Amino acid sequence: MTFDRVAIVEASLDAYLSQAAASPASPAPLAPDAPLREGSGLTARKAVELFEDQLVSRQLDVAARELKKTNRSFYTISSAGHENNVVVGAQLRINDPAFLHYRSGALMMARARQLPGSTPAFDSLLGIVASSDDPIAQGRHKVWGSRPLWVPPQTSTIASHLPKAMGLAFSLARARRLGVATDLPDDAIVLCSFGDATVNHATALAGINTARYAVRLGLPMPILFVCEDNATGISVPTPEGWIAASFGNLEYLRYDLAEGEIDEVWDTVAEAVRYVRGARRPAFLHLRTVRLWGHAGSDAEQSYRSAEEIAENEARDPLLRNARRLVESGAATPDQLQAMLADTRERVMAAAEEATRRPRLETTEEVVAPMAPYHPVGIVARAAKPLLNPAARLELHGGTLPEAALIPTARTLAGCLNAALADELGRRPEVILFGEDVGRKGGVYNVTNGLQRRFGTGRVFDTLLDETSILGIAQGAANIGLLPIAEIQYLAYLHNALDQIRGEAATLQFFSSGQFRNPMVVRVPGLAYQKGFGGHFHNDNSIGALRDIPGVVVAVPARGDDAARMLRGAVAMAAEDGRVVIFLEPIALYH
């Protein structure tokens, strides 16, 4: 048995179209604006467009593997078999933020169709060959991303993008409520796609759980979770019925199964999108897919699948099925589809050759340039900006300015931090402060005491007890112009969620060449514990993992006056350069 499965799958589509073209029987032509099926929202014209976008995606995968044979490409994780996600790309708007699965080729082609003049196929090829002309990552990593299409690039860390997608969905209404301008419409929704193996990860479950939790609290959460189910995690099969059993009957989460013909998938997706946009609630779209050609080009699929299993998978190729649907419905003739396929192959391979001639990053300085932007003049200017007019600031602090306070508790490190947080909330309407117990209680060490009362629950609020979700909210909020100051209650708790900093927040500017950013300050009480208490449950000195993350700033104040100045500088650094600042607060020095 030959294992050049790319050639076999390509030949199967060619064979079907040739046989159909030779057949004497042909259905009556379907008018371009007629539905593909009675009662369906998918027209013949749109179905043909979808098929063309699917063909482009498939040929990008073919080109990546062809170029790899001569060491001219560096990414062979394909979208082959997942091309029905094209329907999601076509039905969402380009100002609906999208956090995408790595098999999103067809989705991106359809999304880009909405932007005249865009060149998504060539852009993708530039990423595959690691060219510095790649408009999103400039050759640093092959990602699906685009600033004009509102697709922040994602890492391939399993499930790590679900919390921040949830965070952005939560923050849409919050920003509008606070009067913070975004570039998104009021009815925007968030798309978050992932695989069936991914959804078992604790990080994925955190994002979905927090979305449901928000609905229970009566908060808007307009997010469409799309699980692209190919029933396989590299070599490990997903048990039959697992996804439906796990997510099909959860309260506060709508579930839709998208399978069957392309028009059936279209109509199911349309209903899910309509629900999320109208109800401002989350939905879980279960999209049936098939994985062709292994996990990636380096994956020897025959080592864990029989020849019969591989052939059975290939028979379920969505392009083959969709071509048959177009021909049998009269939406397109075999000759039209053959011409479209030949033209797509020629265009994509020509573009691939052109991409290999484009420049690449040559120096370390070029590669790391967007990792840690630093503009000290701008930072100082932001930090030195007058806090408020004198009368307003005096009123904010209850008639006594913090620098003139004589009460001992106001001069402690905790007291100075409280005053500095009040100043930042007072002068920056985009600042929000949140975490476990920071609102009504005022923090377990009273550092945020009274701030919710002064600034309201829209800006100072409590979260559920999940550090991953707290950092996800911070990232999502920062993506749309808010400036989050999030609290992780103890340093010991940060390690549960550290990849949200390491793999996600700290890499966004790097992978997007500075086009996307997530400025934030993360307050973390830690180090030596308060006198009279001990044990390993809350206190932690482990900051090595933080110091190992490129681009992250770590600040550790030791005195009250330093703490206030450092916090002001941290917020200014986040605002000016989009930086992620970890602000470690020594518990033993609070009071």
Segments the model singles out, each with a brief description of its role:
Residues D196, A563, G569-H591:
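Conformationally flexible catalytic loops at phosphate/diphosphate-handling active centers
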Residues Q59-V62, E66-I223, G233-R254, G534-H536, ...:
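Cofactor-binding active-site loop characterized by glycine-rich and histidine/acidic residues
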Residues V88-G89, M109-Q114, A202-A206, I234-E240, ...:
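Short acidic, glycine/serine/threonine-rich loops at helix termini
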Residues T182-D186, P239-E271, E314-A342, F511-E576:
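Conserved thiamine diphosphate
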Residues F99-Y102, A159, A165, A169, ...:
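Short beta-strand segments
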Residues E83-V86, W150-L224, T232, E259-Y275, ...:
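Thiamine diphosphate
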Residues M1-N85, Q91-L92, W293-F455, L465:
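Conserved acidic/glycine
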